[in-house]
Amino acid sequence: MSLFGVGFLASAKGKRVCAIGRSSLGKISDPLEVPNLLDLQLDSFDWLIGGPRWRVALDAYRKNPSGAPIAEKSGLDEVFDEISPIEDSAGNMQLNFSKPVLEAEELSVRECRVRGRTYSAPLYVEAEFMNHDTGEIKTQTVFMGDFPLMTDKGTFVINGTERVVVSQLVRSPGVYFERTPEKNSEKDLFSGRIIPARGAWLEFEVDRHDQLGVRVDRKRRQPVIFFLRAIGMTDDEIRDAFGEFESISVQHEKNIGLSRDDALREIYRRVRPGEQASAEAGRALLENFYFTSRRFDLARVGRYKVNRKLGVDVDPTRMVLTRSDIIATIRYLAALHLGFSEVAVLNSNKSVPISTDDIDHLGNRRIRPVGELVQNQLRAGLARMERVVRERMTTQDIEAIIPQTLINVMPIVAALKEFYGTSQLSQFMDQNNPLAGLTHKRRLSALGPGGLSRERAGVEVRDVNPSHYGRMCPIETPEGPNIGLIGSLACYSRVNSFGFIETPYRRVVNGKVTDDIEYMTATQEDEHAIAQASTPLRPDNSFVDERVLVRRKGGEVEVVPADQVDYMDVSGRQMVSVATSLIPFLEHNDANRALMGSNMQRQAVPLLVTESPLVGTGMERYVAIDAGDVLIAEDPGIVGDVSADVVTVKQDDGKHRDYHVGKFVRSNQGNCYNQRVVVRSGDRVEKGTVLADGPCTDKGELSLGRNLLVAFMPWEGYNFEDAIIISQNLVKDDTLSSIHIEEHEVSTRDTKLGSEEITRDLPNVSMDYIKDLDERGIIRIGAEVGPGDILVGKVTPKGETELSAEERLLRAIFNEKSMEVRDTSLKVPHGQQGTVIDVKLFDAVDGEDKLGAGINQRVVVYIAHKRKITEGDKLAGRHGNKGVISKILPVEDMPFMADGTPVDIILNPLGVPARMNFGQVLETHLGWISKQGWKIEGDPDWAKDIRVREAQPDSRVSSPVFDGISEGEITGLFSSVFPNRDGERAVGSDGKAILYDGRTGEPFPEPISVGYMYVLKLHHLVDDKIHARSTGPYSMITQQPLGGKAQFGGQRFGEMEVWALEAYGAAHALQELLTIKSDDVVGRVKVYDAIVKGYPIPTPGVPESFKVIVKEMQSLCINIEVVSDGEDDVSADAETLQIEEGLDTSPKVEVGSLEEV
C-alpha cells in the first residue's frame, strides 16, 4: 500500500480490462472513457498531503495553463503557512512552521482492520523559534501527531472500521445580488452581499424609498454614505464613482460636511450599541472585519467569483476586501436597481452584464471535498494550539525555550479524532456491495457543519436545477426527509480546484463535431448552445439535420442552425450517476421508479454464486474495477504460484509481486466479503487484467443479482399487490443464497473487586454447554452454534457475602482467598445461529495491541450463516420493481414452456402500467433474445443501426442509457433468434409464449410475456425482522412490554387489532391481551407461576392503564370507586405492591420456549 493512498487504483486504470465480451447495442461511440470514479476522493486527499497526483497536475498546469488554476501549495503547507508566525504579545519571540512531512505508516491497512487501530502516518513539521532580543534561532523537527491516511479505495480506517468522508455541497464565497418582491407595494427590493469563506458579511440593500443602505456584520442598517466616508473616500471620489446614481448622490448632498471620524463613530455606535464610540474604535472595527487576513478570508474561490462578477482586476492572491471591491459592488447594485443591462467598471474601458443570482445554481454552489474538510479541522486544531503556545511563551524561561517545549499536539490530535469519529460528514462506510461503497464515496451532501439543516431546507434548494445537467444526478437521491439534500456526482463530472463541478463537452466547429474535449463549469456553460449526445451525425462528424436541438442558459431548449452549435454532450449517460447508469432502458422508466431502482441496487446482498446480467448498460466493468473490490494486475507478467489467499506474478521486469486475496471477511453491513482467484498458474496477464473477482463481481463486471426466467401473469392471487412467487429450484440450487457474518466481541477489564477472567471453569454450567470451548474458554473454529450458546467463557468477581463461622475457620486454615464469581460469558444472541469461522484474541500484555484503559484482553468471534431465499424476503429488479416473496412453489407446480422449461419467478402484470416502468418489460424481452442468441439474415430495414449481426446463446449485451435498442429492433431480433432443436421459436415476435399450468398440464388461455430479468436479493431479510417473545423487559412507566426486536420487546396490539377481535366477539382472547399479556402486573406474575407449576391460568386482574384512567378522572374532581362482586375496592394499589414485594424473587431470565419453562 502506498503512503499516499493511491496504490494500484491510480496506476492500473489506464484501460479497464474485462474478461466478459459484452456486445453494445448503442448507436453512439463515446469519445471519452469514463474517468476513475474515485478521483473526487483520491485527488482531494492527495492535494492535502502534497502527493504525486497533485504534483503531476500542477506541473501539467504550469506547462499549459487552461481551466481553473491548480493550487500552488499543498493543503498542509497552506495551513502551516497561515498560522506562522506565532508571536508573543510584546513581539519579542516568534515561532514559525514549515515543511510538513508524513513519514511511513506504522501498520498496513490490513493490520489496522484486524487490530482495531487507525491507519495513519506520523506528521512531522520543522519548527523555528526566534528570539528577537538576542537574535537567537532554534530549529527542531517536531512531531505533530498521527495523521489518518486514505487507503487506495478512498476510505479511512478509524479504530479498525472503514469510514468515508462525504463531500459537502455549500454556498460558494463571493458576491451575490438578489431581487425580492415587496409585500405591501409593487416595488421590488434589491440587495447585494459579499459573503466570505471566513469572517463578517457585508450587505448593501435598496429600500422601498430608493435609499441605498449598508449592514455591517448583519447588524442595523445605516446609510451607505457613512460607510464610504469611513473607508476614506473624499467628496470628489464619491461624486466620480456614484454621480450617475441618484440613490447615493442624494445621501451625499445631505451629508456633505460629514467627516471620516464622525462616520467611523456612527458606524461603531450602530454595530456595538451601548459601548463608548470613538473614531479609533470604529477604524479598528472595520479593519478587523474586512481588511485583516486573520479575521476575513474570501478564499481563492471567493476572490475569483468577486473578480468575475464585478469585473474588477484585483490580485487573485489577495483574500481581503479592497476599496475597489466595495465601490464596484455598490455601483452594480445601484445599476441593478435602475434596471440597467450592464454597468461600466470604474477606471477601465470594459463593462459587465447585470443579472441577479440564483443561489441554487451550481455556479454558486461548490464542493468541499475531503481534503478541504480535513484541512479546516486541522486549522481549528492549530488555532487551539496557538493559544497554548502564546501562553507558554509568557510563562517559560526564555533561555530554556525550544520549539518542542512550546508545542502541545493534543489539540490537533483531538480535532482530527473528533472529525473522523463524530462529524456528520465522516460516515460508517456502506459496504453492502461494491456499488454501495462507490456511491457512498461519490455522494454530495448539503447537510453538515456550515451547510443546511433538513428542517429548514425548502423546496427550491432540494429541486432539480438545470445547472445539475452532467454534474449532479437528477435521479439518485434518498426518498425520505433528505430528498434533494443528498445527491450523487454524475458519471463524467469532476471537481476543479475552486470546488466547482465541471462536465465535459465535445467542441463543435462550423457544424462539425470534433474530438476535442473541454470541461466547463455551470457558469461557463450558460454562454453556449449545446447539442445532445444522441444528435445524428454523418461519418465525417457533421450534423445530419440542418437545424439541431440545443440547450441554452436556464435549461431553455430551442432549435438552431447547425453552424450555431458550440458544443455537444460526450455521452448519453453524462447526466446521470453511476447507479442510475446501470439501469438498462432507463429512458422508458418513470423518474420516481428510476430513483427507487438506483437506491435498491445499493441494497443488493452479495450472493453465493455471482452472475453478470444478460442485459447491462456497459458501465458494469467501470464500477467493479473502480470500486476496488476486484484484484487487478499492476504490471504485465506471468502468473506463478496461486493459492486461495495469495497470487504471485512474475513481472516482465523480473520482479515477483504477491497479491493478497481477501477471504471471508465481514463487511460493515455483516455481509461476506470474499475474493475468488480467476487466473491459473502460467497464465499471461497484462496491466489491468482481473486476477480475482470480489463480492458481487463476475469476471470483472458488477454482478448484483441473478438472471431468472420470469413470467408476467397472476397465479391464484399469490402475487397480488407486488407479491412474488418463486420456484423451489431457487432454494434447492442456492441461486439466491447469501452468506452473512456476525461479529461478537467481549473484553475483560479490571474491576474494583479484581480482574475479570476468560476461562472454561464457569460456575453452575454443565459440560454440555462448554463442550465446544477450548482450554482457554474460547469457542473452537468450526463449531455450530445457536441462540444462547456460550462463545467465550468469562467470569467477573462478585462482592464477598457474609461468611458463616465454619467457612471463616476453613478459610483461616487453608488460607483460601478465592472470591465468588458470576458468569458473564459471551453468548449467541436471540435469533442468531451459524458456524464459527474465526476467533481473534488480543492481549494487552503483548504491547502490540493497544486495547484502551483498563482492558486486559479482547476476544472477537465471527459466526457465518448461509441464508437461503425464503418467504418474506424482498426481491427487486433494476427498475424500481420490488416485492416480497409470498409463496415458494414446488417446481412441478410452476408454469412451464412448450419445451418443458419451468419459469423461475412469477410477477404480477398489474405492477407495470401504473408504475410506468416499462424498462422491465423491454429488459425481459432482450434478456430472452440474448439468452437464446441471434443471427440477422440479409439486411432488413429495422437492423440498419444494429452493429452486432450475430450473437451466440448466453451472450451478454449492453443497452446504454439514453442510447438503447428500440422497440422495433427488439421485435426484429425476436424473428432472428436461434430456433430450438425442433426448429421452433418458443417466444413470438410480441415477446409472448404459450405457458402450461404445472398442476394440470393445460395451457393457459392467453400467451404470456416470458423472458430473463436480472433480479436482486435485497438486504431486507425476513430472518433479521422476525421476532417473538414469551417473557422479557417491561417499561418502568407504563408497565407494558418494550417495543422492537432490539429491546426484545413484544408485538403491539393496537386499536385496529382490538376492533378486529371485537368484531369476532373474541372476549377472552381480548381480555388476555389487554391484561396479563400487557400491564396487569399482579396477573402476569401469577400466570408465570401457574405455567411453571402446571396449574390452570388464573383470571386477569386490573391493568395499570385502567388505574391511570381512574387517576385522570379523579384529577377532574370525579370520584371513581371500582368495586368487585364482593364489594371489595379493586383499584387500591396496596395489594399490588404487597404481591410484587412478595414475588420479587421471580426469575428475571428471558425464557425462549415453554420447554425451557
UniProtKB/Swiss-Prot annotation:
This is DNA-directed RNA polymerase subunit beta. InterPro entries: DNA-dir_RNA_pol_bsu_ext_1_sf (IPR042107), DNA-dir_RNA_pol_bsu_external_1 (IPR019462), DNA-dir_RNA_pol_su2 (IPR015712), DNA-dir_RNAP_su2_dom (IPR007120), DNA-dir_RNAP_su2_hyb_sf (IPR037033), RNA_pol_bsu_bac (IPR010243), RNA_pol_bsu_CS (IPR007121), RNA_pol_bsu_protrusion (IPR007644). The RNAP catalytic core consists of 2 alpha, 1 beta, 1 beta' and 1 omega subunit. When a sigma factor is associated with the core the holoenzyme is formed, which can initiate transcription. It holds the Pfam family RNA_pol_Rpb2_1. Its EC number is 2.7.7.6. DNA-dependent RNA polymerase catalyzes the transcription of DNA into RNA using the four ribonucleoside triphosphates as substrates. It comes from Tropheryma whipplei (strain Twist) (Whipple's bacillus). Gene3D superfamilies: 2.40.50.100, 2.40.50.150, 3.90.1100.10, DNA-directed RNA polymerase, beta subunit, external 1 domain, DNA-directed RNA polymerase, subunit 2, domain 6, RNA polymerase alpha subunit dimerisation domain, RNA polymerase Rpb2, domain 2. PROSITE patterns: RNA_POL_BETA.
